[in-house]
Amino acid sequence: MEGLVRVPVREQEPKVRATNFEEVCYGYNEEEAVAEASRCLNCKNAQCMKGCPVSINIPAFIAQVKERNFEEAYHIISESSALPAVCGRVCPQESQCEGKCIRGFKGDPVAIGKLERFVADWAREHGIKPKKAEKLNGHKVAVIGSGPAGLTCAGDLAKLGYDVTIFEALHRAGGVLSYGIPEFRLPKDKVVAAEVENVKALGVDIETNVVIGKSVKIDELMEKEGFEAVFIGSGAGLPRFMGIPGEQANGVFSANEFLTRNNLMKAFEEGYETPISHGKKVVVVGGGNVAMDAARTALRLGAEVHIIYRRGEEELPARKEEVHHAKEEGIIFDLLQNPTEILVDENGWVKGVRIIKMELGEPDASGRRSPVEIPGSEYEMDCDTVIMSLGTSPNPLISSTTKGLETNRRKCIVATEDTGATSKDGVYAGGDAVTGAATVILAMGAGKAAAKGIDEYLSGKNN
């Protein structure tokens, strides 16, 4: 039946893309976007919007795409999202907006993410910018971190007339968008830098190389620099490890370090001062999106890559699209297996991993079946690089240097979900700094909620 199947999106061939860092997905052209937009039923009670953490008016922007009013479609999206070109590429739409699309009950859901990407890319190519506030309201707000939570909070506050400054610890803005997600999924100059410039075009200042807690403390920002409120969106950058023998060997990386050095610092380029050792045979431990990113990056650097994950394929937390792409490119999945030791040679370098096979038992607290070791099933695999992708936690630097800021046992900042308010008056927080490692769009949703909370707080003080 007509309309049941979505317009396919063009991609690089797997064998070709496995050798380069160019973007895998080409996205829709105008004709493809209009055709896909025509599949939208324009539901009066749009369930897709309920699945969007930043509440984009999805039917409205798609209706404009259908009529080829691409600029108006962009302005509708940018009312709610500061990062549409990013979200269109990396959001898990299949479990959010597209997961609730009525079309999906009898066919393919509308490709909402691909349409959002098309609109954002079209706007960038045609020099269209989000609308700026007409005048400032006289209030200063500091935002810590220029990742998705910080950029969203800053952008929303700037639209309301606030004088906003973002403080970024690294030399380049973007947070995890710049250092964590590979070029082949999210181009840095073409997309991330352009989205950052759009936020700056709203009137937001961004100061890089400022480490809050070292360069300056939150209390100093509020007491000496005149900032009336602070939003903490500093992310979760401390990697977790397994605690098994051999983890201190040369050739063991956290996925965070491996991706940062390749994405942000281009350490794979010849002549780089501190080149990264990527090895000929790489083992990536973990099954999330970050594990897929690390594995696919190592593959592009010329390695044979194995992903070791202690559960089965159905339990992989990575997006199905990322798993599909990894398999197409030739990455080997060793499922229901878990490392017990990293083997080290006489010079302190990785020479292999000892692995035990697993089986699934009863469900754990997350609802997934718990992996159980199979006695006597251990074996050894040769490799020269191991990348641990086991999640991250927030750096305690900010919380340990800010009086009255409450954290939980995981060192995450305690903040209310609806406003981002913390235990310290005038200080708000959201994203991975509060939840631990999560998705880009959830961090954006938290930044949006905090912007609303800060506006209500400062408006209340003014009255």
Q: Where is each model-derived feature located?
A:
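A conserved FAD-binding loop/helix module that cradles the flavin
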Residues: A433-G460
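Feature captures the FAD/FMN-dependent oxidoreductase FAD-binding
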Residues: E72, K135-L136, K140-I144, V196-I244, ...
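Rossmann-like dinucleotide-binding cores of NAD(P)H-dependent redox enzymes
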Residues: D163-I166, L170-A201, D205-E207, A295-E341
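Ferredoxin-type iron-sulfur electron-transfer modules in oxidoreductases and energy-metabolism complexes
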Residues: R17-A35, N57-R89, K106-A133, N262-N263
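FAD-site-proximal beta/loop scaffold in flavoenzymes
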Residues: Q248-G279, P363-A437
